[in-house]
Amino acid sequence: MKHSTSDGTVYQRNGFGPTVVLIHGLGMNRAMWQWQLPSLTKDFDVLTYDLWGHGESSNPPSRPSLRLFSDQLIGLLNEANVTTTGVVGFSIGGMIARRFAYDHPSRLSALAI
């Protein structure tokens, strides 16, 4: 099911279990994970989202940076009531995942880049 946060981040949440967030690559959107979702949602609560300026999400509120995208992710987790999560990042998503791990280590249960 598709949702939108107060800052214009569009995301989907599917499955049950520990939460895992999937971050897409530059110029892509959350649909890139469509082939992994059937397997992952059997065991995990999976959040996929569009980075600001990608897919259905709004444009970034200021000049894009890894810090800004890390802030986008923490905002998403707060609005979705997720306390800890595993994060999987592809391409720039991996860079954002590393920045998120640096900024919010207590919110991270696992990291895959």
Region roles according to the model:
Residues 1-20, 41-45, 82-84, 113:
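Alpha/beta-hydrolase fold catalytic core
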Residues 16-17, 25-28, 91:
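Active-site glycine-rich loops that stabilize anionic/oxyanionic intermediates
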